[in-house]
Amino acid sequence: MRAVVLLSGGMDSLVATAEADALGYELAAMHVNYGQRTWHKELMAFRAICDHYGIRHRLEVDADYLSAIGGSSLTDPSIPVEEADLHGATIPTSYVPFRNASFLSMAVAWSEVIGAEKIYIGAVEEDSSGYPDCRKVFYDAFNRVIELGTRPETAIGIETPLIELQKSAIVRRGIALQVPFRLSWSCYKSEGKACGHCDSCARRLRAFSLAGATDPIDYEQRPDYI
């Protein structure tokens, strides 16, 4: 059995990779560089995680068109990365318009070519930033798109093992699976030490605190988000 994992290098995609590995899939890993601020750090994390799990079949894709489209603080330097607002009801500026649909389309195409049966993605709907393309209903609908848009003999399904978990539960699950959190990168802003203040850093730090664990990566600051 073969599975493609969409591996950004962040903690969620790392744990999703570990879930697929634990089920005995032969893993193929895809990473997308889309002009994000921390693209180099994320790419290094992707490669280190692949090395850790012995994933030899890798695909690194350049999707600069997402940067050209803009509209996100991750890809447009004129839009500042916001300070975290963990109780806000609006979608933050870090949302990249329809990004996951682009990623999934590429992953489906690759899966069809290499004969993968599953696509693993570390999307999180609960305790998340509220991105519309991280909802379970989106992935249910995309599975239907795959069914209609691939060859009749193709059977590819999207797996979202973390979709209904709180971030702290993802940390605990990662600890149980002995994942190398030290190799992952989540910060939206910095490629040196993680900033500790962006939405992604805040949610990660809070998750580790609630799980009773220490995040092993370096931060410029470690605010208490509990």
From Swiss-Prot:
Keywords: ATP-binding, Ligase, Metal-binding, Nucleotide-binding, Queuosine biosynthesis, Zinc
EC number assigned by the record: 6.3.4.20
Entry function: Catalyzes the ATP-dependent conversion of 7-carboxy-7-deazaguanine (CDG) to 7-cyano-7-deazaguanine (preQ(0)).
Binding site for ATP: L7, S8, G9, G10, M11, D12, S13, L14, V15, A16, T17
NCBIfam families from the UniProt entry: 7-cyano-7-deazaguanine synthase QueC
Gene (name only): queC
UniProt pathway: Purine metabolism; 7-cyano-7-deazaguanine biosynthesis
HAMAP family recorded: QueC
Keyword Cytoplasm set for record: no
The organism's taxonomic lineage, starting at the top: Bacteria, Pseudomonadati, Chlorobiota, Chlorobiia, Chlorobiales
Cofactor mode of binding and number, as noted: Binds 1 zinc ion per subunit.
One MF annotation (Gene Ontology) recorded for this entry: ATP binding
InterPro entries according to UniProt: QueC, Rossmann-like_a/b/a_fold
Enzyme class: ligase
Cofactor(s) the protein requires to work: Zn(2+)
Catalytic function, reaction form: 7-carboxy-7-deazaguanine + NH4(+) + ATP = 7-cyano-7-deazaguanine + ADP + phosphate + H2O + H(+)
BP term (GO), one: queuosine biosynthetic process
Binding residues for Zn(2+): C187, C195, C198, C201
Name of this chain's protein: 7-cyano-7-deazaguanine synthase
CDD domains: QueC-like (cd01995)
Family: Belongs to the QueC family.
Presence of keyword Zinc-finger: no
